[in-house]
A protein has these predicted regions:
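Short, charged recognition helix plus adjacent turn
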Residues: 1, 38, 45, 67-80
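A short, Lys/Arg-rich alpha-helix, primarily the initiator
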Residues: 1-20
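Residues within the helices of the helix-turn-helix
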Residues: 12, 23, 53
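Residues in the recognition helix of alpha-helical DNA-binding motifs
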Residues: 14, 28, 39, 69
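The alpha-helix within a helix-turn-helix
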Residues: 15, 26, 56
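Short alpha-helical DNA-recognition segment
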Residues: 19-38
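Short, basic-rich loop-to-helix N-cap that marks the start of a DNA-contacting helix
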Residues: 43-57
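Intrinsically disordered, low-complexity basic tails/linkers immediately adjacent to helix-turn-helix/homeobox/MYB/SANT
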Residues: 57-65
Length: 80
């Protein structure tokens, strides 16, 4: 699993926990639906930290809370 995969999975998990759709999340966060769809569908292999921060703000969580998930602890180190 890559970091981008983990971010995608975490966003989906957070939406499921809060029972909101990706469309609703985009509205709450003030980002475009296409940006969120690109992240979700793998079109964005390197989501910007600023975008992740907007998602966190919309969900009323910190970046630390976003990344404090088992998903990120299991990542293999990416070397490019």
């Amino acid at each position: 699993m890559t970091l981008a995969d983990a971010v995608r999975e975490r966003i989906v998990d957070l939406c499921n926990e809060r029972n909101i759709t990706l469309n609703k999340l985009a509205t709450i966060c003030g980002i475009t639906q296409s940006t969120l769809n690109n992240i979700r569908n793998g079109g964005s292999n390197n989501p910007k930290l600023a975008t992740i921060k907007k998602i966190c703000d919309g969900l009323n969580i910190t970046l630390e809370q976003f990344f404090a998930s088992e998903i990120f602890y299991q990542l293999e180190q990416e070397i490019e």
